[in-house]
Regions:
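Sec-dependent N-terminal signal peptides
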Residues: 4-13
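Short glycine/proline- and aromatic-enriched beta-strand/turn motifs that initiate or cap beta-hairpins
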Residues: 16-70, 212-218
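Residues that define the transmembrane beta-barrel architecture of outer-membrane proteins
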Residues: 23-29, 50-58, 103-109, 159-165, ...
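Transmembrane beta-strands of outer-membrane beta-barrel proteins
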Residues: 27-33, 74-80, 109-111, 124-130, ...
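Transmembrane beta-strands of outer-membrane beta-barrel pores
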Residues: 33-41, 64, 82-88, 105-108, ...
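Flexible, solvent-exposed loop segments that connect beta-strands
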Residues: 39-51, 84-106, 138-159, 190-200
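Outer-membrane beta-barrel architecture
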Residues: 59-65, 110-116, 168, 208-210
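Predominantly the C-terminal beta-signal and adjacent terminal strand-loop region
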Residues: 83, 154-218
Length: 218
């Protein structure tokens, strides 16, 4: 709840919104949730690198106004799609020659509060905000050499919270159906494997389709 209050206060100060308009601001903020998988691979002579891998994702978003006292979920979007990308390497200070090449999978549950960006009225909409990702689970898949078993569970100490910026763009195809494009830009080292000498943050691009459910009487 504190995070919600801080985010609303930040938007209010940024856009110079008065107290009278504070209620309208709350109605405009969207609560977003998403499940996705990030990847990082150890490569020969390179500390870590991203792979061009696609993974399915699914999510749910609703405006805060839909969670009112009347309990009417009047604007809920169900989102399905896939994400492209994964971890972006950084802070690699030396070259390491790996005898075993491995791929790390980390599954995240992302949530975010987003605010609509000022665009002309039309079929195109855009929102942005901060997201928080909690690691659900992770595993190591050997690519070549070393391991006998196909997958190894990743230790919880390697599963770091993911925090970053979210940009979402929608294009309305119908009153209930929209095309979605999302960009997640991690700000922290959500993957930290100091034993092998590298850290990484999330960089994810996703596309998909959203369906709007509404129980509001026309």
């Amino acid at each position: 709840m504190k995070a919600v209050i801080l985010y609303i206060s930040f938007i209010s100060i940024t856009f110079g919104i008065s107290r009278k308009d504070f209620g309208n601001l709350v109605k405009s903020i969207t609560l977003y949730g998403n499940i996705n998988t990030s990847y990082v691979v150890t490569d020969s002579y390179i500390g870590a690198d991203t792979e061009n891998i696609s993974s399915y994702s699914y999510g749910l978003e609703t405006q805060l106004s839909s969670l009112g006292l009347k309990g009417r979920y009047n604007k809920i979007y169900l989102n399905l799609g896939y994400s492209q990308g994964g971890f972006f390497q950084r802070n690699i200070h030396e070259t390491i020659n790996y005898e075993v090449q491995k791929r790390y999978h980390i599954h995240y549950a992302h949530s975010a509060l987003t605010y609509p960006l000022p665009l002309p009225k039309g079929k195109l909409q855009s929102t942005s905000g901060l997201y928080f990702g909690l690691p659900i689970s992770g595993n190591i898949e050997p690519v070549k050499g070393g391991f006998n078993q196909p997958e190894i569970e990743l230790k919880k100490s390697y599963l770091k919270t993911d925090i970053g910026l979210l940009l979402m763009i929608k294009y309305k195809l119908h009153s209930s159906i929209s095309l979605l494009s999302t960009v997640k830009y991690g700000l922290n080292n959500s993957f930290d494997y100091t034993y092998e000498g590298y850290k990484a943050s999330n960089r994810i691009i996703g596309i998909g389709i959203g369906y709007r459910y509404s129980d509001r009487k026309k």
